[in-house]
Regions:
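Nucleotide-state-sensitive switch-loop elements of NTP-binding domains
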Residues: 1-49, 53-56, 62
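Hydrophobic/aromatic beta-strand patches that form the interior of the parallel beta-sheet core
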Residues: 7-9, 59-61, 84-87, 118
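Conserved nucleotide-binding/hydrolysis micro-motifs of P-loop NTPases
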Residues: 13-16, 45-48, 66-70, 91-94, ...
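Conserved ATPase-coupling elements of RecA-like P-loop NTPase cores
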Residues: 20, 47-53, 71-74, 95-99
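Residue-level signature of catalytic and energy-coupling elements of molecular machines
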Residues: 24, 42, 79, 89, ...
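Short, conserved loop/helix-junction motifs that constitute active-site signature segments
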Residues: 55, 79-82
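Canonical P-loop GTPase G-domain recognition
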Residues: 82-85, 91-141
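Long, well-ordered amphipathic alpha-helical subdomains in the mid-to-C-terminal portions
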Residues: 119, 130-191
């Protein structure tokens, strides 16, 4: 197995509606077949589109900064529901500890397990090794299994539609009104 090497590859999102390109699932499968033990997927930012990473990830780690506004928290709500761990980076800045406490409180109000919430400062190299140790031993929390399968189902369906050889023809038919959206889905979905 490959344990200590690092392979980095940037991928354009292309036709994907989420932050994770459709081809990434195939790349992960290939890397696992090539004996890579761990594959880390970095997404492009925050927001609801980030939940699509659940379609291909075994574990989800959300990295936050301190003093994030309520609007950003609302954007990340879906992603935080899927989180197996949360890291509040930049713990050297004001508000980091308070933000970590608020995250823990919000998790404790929910159902299921509370993921670990860790403080780190990459700048000052504080908490980074400890967080890495926790992440390496992170077991599947089970708190988001249904949500992950939902995202996998949606991503698979999206990929099936986008890769259909009939897509352009169906889009043309929709544009002129000769078929309904339900008919288009039936054709593209192979029903």
């Amino acid at each position: 197995t490959i344990k200590n090497d690092i392979y980095i590859r940037s991928i354009a999102t292309r036709k994907s509606s989420g932050s994770v390109p459709l081809i990434v699932a195939d790349m992960i499968d290939f890397l696992h077949m090539a004996k890579w033990d761990r594959v880390i997927i970095e997404t492009v930012g925050s927001g609801q589109s980030e939940v699509r990473c659940a379609a291909i990830a075994d574990r989800i780690v959300v990295v936050e900064g301190p003093a994030r506004g309520d609007g950003v928290q609302a954007e990340k709500a879906g992603l935080l529901e899927l989180a197996d761990a949360v890291i509040v980076n930049k713990s050297d800045l004001p508000g980091a500890s308070k933000h970590a406490e608020e995250l823990l409180e919000s998790f404790e109000l929910g159902l299921g397990d509370t993921p670990p919430v860790m403080l780190t400062s990459a700048l000052n190299e504080l908490g980074v090794e400890e967080a890495a140790g926790v992440l390496l031993e992170l077991a599947d929390s089970g708190r988001s299994v249904r949500a992950r399968w939902r995202e996998r189902l949606l991503a698979y369906n999206e990929r099936k539609i986008l890769e259909s050889p009939k897509l352009e023809e169906i889009l043309g038919s929709l544009a002129v009104g000769s078929i309904s959206i339900d008919e288009a889905i039936n054709v593209l979905g192979g029903e």
